[in-house]
Amino acid sequence: VAPVVPDLSSDIDTSNFDDLEEDKGEEETFPIPKAFVGNQLPFVGFTYYSNRRYLSSANPNDNRTSSNADKSLQESLQKTIYKLEEQLHNEMQLKDEMEQKCRTSNIKLDKIMKELDEEGNQRRNLESTVSQIEKEKMLLQHRINEYQRKAEQENEKRRNVENEVSTLKDQLEDLKKVSQNSQLANEKLSQLQKQLEEANDLLRTESDTAVRLRKSHTEMSKSISQLESLNRELQERNRILENSKSQTDKDYYQLQAILEAERRDRGHDSEMIGDLQARITSLQEEVKHLKHNLEKVEGERKEAQDMLNHSEKEKNNLEIDLNYKLKSLQQRLEQEVNEHKVTKARLTDKHQSIEEAKSVAMCEMEKKLKEEREAREKAENRVVQIEKQCSMLDVDLKQSQQKLEHLTGNKERMEDEVKNLTLQLEQESNKRLLLQNELKTQAFEADNLKGLEKQMKQEINTLLEAKRLLEFELAQLTKQYRGNEGQMRELQDQLEAEQYFSTLYKTQVKELKEEIEEKNRENLKKIQELQNEKETLATQLDLAETKAESEQLARGLLEEQYFELTQESKKAASRNRQEITDKDHTVSRLEEANSMLTKDIEILRRENEELTEKMKKAEEEYKLEKEEEISNLKAAFEKNINTERTLKTQAVNKLAEIMNRKDFKIDRKKANTQDLRKKEKENRKLQLELNQEREKFNQMVVKHQKELNDMQAQLVEECAHRNELQMQLASKESDIEQLRAKLLDLSDSTSVASFPSADETDGNLPESRIEGWLSVPNRGNIKRYGWKKQYVVVSSKKILFYNDEQDKEQSNPSMVLDIDKLFHVRPVTQGDVYRAETEEIPKIFQILYANEGECRKDVEMEPVQQAEKTNFQNHKGHEFIPTLYHFPANCDACAKPLWHVFKPPPALECRRCHVKCHRDHLDKKEDLICPCKVSYDVTSARDMLLLACSQDEQKKWVTHLVKKIPKNPPSGFVRASPRTLSTRSTANQSFRKVVKNTSGKTR
């Protein structure tokens, strides 16, 4: 994108281009040739006849009369010719004089034009230098503004660092609170010891408890050693704090030395600035002198131009007069020539004596020609002299031009010196500004360091007081311990209970230590992140400087457009006033609409609350009814089973009695064959009855099992429906939160002039909400099955996962996590996710949460390949694993044998409730298998892997979710569970485990 996009009024808009003046070069003047050519002189031609045949044939009398007449005519003609020749000669002289004047005036004009061109070039050069200086001034102003922006950015960074320091101080206060809690625990221990002493007073008589007392003695010594280790740790912390204090003192002294050096540099710089200011004043005086000379030259140029214009006017007038006179003379000449020809014809016809007169006239004409030739030679000599003078003038001109060039060179050198001095001045002024800014920043840092030193001293004093108190308490405890050594031998059975409490205390202390260690690690990570951010900011600074240099050029163009924009802004101000009046009306309408929307939202919220209450009541009633029905059914089934068992036992007992009554001694007693037959018949009847009763019993069991399966399936469906409703409710609540935030933004913006843009409204959304695209693993093996993209929304209470944006619009999430059940959020390492690619690892992060905080849709997994024995199949809550039975086992669904010694049929076993069944039942989708009776442990922890689009987004998500983690652990959950079940503990608990769903994993 270009740094500046100018507004164009049309396709032929060239207002953004500068009008460049064409460089008018010096006019080419060819020198006058010194050799005489003669092509500028007029040609005069005449004709004559050499034969005298006309004279021989004429009479002498006729010749005399004609000669008299011809003489008179000839004299008149000669007079006219003389007059004409004199006029011609005068006009030729005038013409030569005018031509000489024109040449001299042209030479003068050429000189003046050259001088004017040189002065124009000098003026243009000066104007260009002035414009360059102005541009440099604008660039310097732009740089100053940029440095101010950079200073503001550094101030913001410093504020951020101060905020982090404040957070670290808060953590220190938390540690102090922990130490106070330990003191309270010590007080509790002392109270318990007093109770033990009272118990010892009561039970001194018993001597059998000596061994137990010795054990308690050793345990107390261990507790004292633990307290001593705690004391040592506190002493070490105190030493660390003292070392940090000494380091801060050293830094303070170093900063003071740097400040003094900078003050010295500042004094030196101020002296340099004074010298430069003196130089600037001298240069300004020189510039004024040059300007004065320029003004004089311009005045002379104007006078010369006026003279030139006047001479041009005179020249034009003379040319017009000469042309007019030449034309009139040519016309007269033509008329006289014609008349002369006519008279010649007449004279030839009438008189032959005129030829003699002509010969005389010709002689006279030859004399005149000779005179004219002599005059011409004189004129040529004059021309040669004039050319010599011209050559001398050319030499003088060249000398004057060389002098001018020398002067222009001196002028350019002076201008270069002026430019260099101005540049030095600007550089030194920039250095001065930079030094002033650095002094200010260092003074500010020194003040901050002083404040930090005071705070550190206060903290050290508080820690020393705490140390003294602990030492005093230790001394008291040692005294009590020495006094109680004799009494310890007579402690009794109540000590076991107290030992239990002490073990609980130890576990709490361990947990607190682990939490402190985790906080320290997090602080180290934060410091590393800050260092990385510092490096990235340095690179960004370099990029910003390069951008600034490119923007400086754009700034010049923008400042040229500024004047036009100010004029347009005045026009736009009047328009804005009208628009503001219109927008005030729209604001009132929007406020009315806002009030209506708030009312609608309140109504919706009330309806939502009522619906949730109704749902809860209906769920409770349904649960009670289901429990009553199940209890009644269980009681009825138990009664039937008991009665059938009693009947069965009675029948078996009868059979045993009958069998016992038989006498197998044939030799002694020979029973009758009829009695035997009767007994056999009775036995058969009894066996038939038994079989019938067994069949009835089996039918009843199958019926009841089917009913139970149906009830459990209904329960599962209703639970799934309830989960879906809860998920939809959560998504609706997040949408309502977003709408409320937007409404608050609208209510805050009272005037239309301060209405935020679309970008600002997006930026003003509450910090509790974040949304975007994240990827979730399809199954356990990421390398084989890959990732699945989901749209994730984090509201103030829930984390919602959508398959796509349509599901988000329809408020149909695939999974919802409760933020209150979050334990931990962290970026993942190579050891955690060894199946993922190395490029993806910096983008992956892990969420640890309680199982009870998860709510998802029941999506049945795809059939798993037989090769993967570690994978399992989900069906009605079961997690079936494929197995083979070589020992006796029956199917729990169809009661058929499930085993064979050599070729057992394919079987499945639930790894939760250990129900066995044939694989065919699940493949054929038979409804014989009852739902799983064993559910997940609600208090078990679970983790989820999430893949962000980039590393920056991963950091953003992690920091946001870390802020969301509740400080108190979820109710009903063991605090140590997520730590003991960490992903990096053992190979069995690594990510090689099979995931239950697309993202979750049972821990």
UniProtKB/Swiss-Prot annotation:
* Region (Auto-inhibitory) location: 764-1003
The alphabetized UniProt keywords are: Acetylation, Apoptosis, ATP-binding, Cell membrane, Cell projection, Coiled coil, Cytoplasm, Cytoskeleton, Golgi apparatus, Kinase, Magnesium, Membrane, Metal-binding, Nucleotide-binding, Phosphoprotein, Serine/threonine-protein kinase, Transferase, Zinc, Zinc-finger
Gene transcribed to yield this protein: ROCK1
How is this protein situated with respect to the membrane? Peripheral membrane protein
What organism does the record attribute this protein to? Pan troglodytes (Chimpanzee)
Q: Which is one Gene Ontology cellular component term of this protein?
A: ruffle
How is this protein named in the record? Rho-associated protein kinase 1
Q: Which SMART domains match?
A: C1 (SM00109), PH (SM00233)
Q: Which residues form the PH domain?
A: 767-966
What residues form the membrane-spanning segments?
none
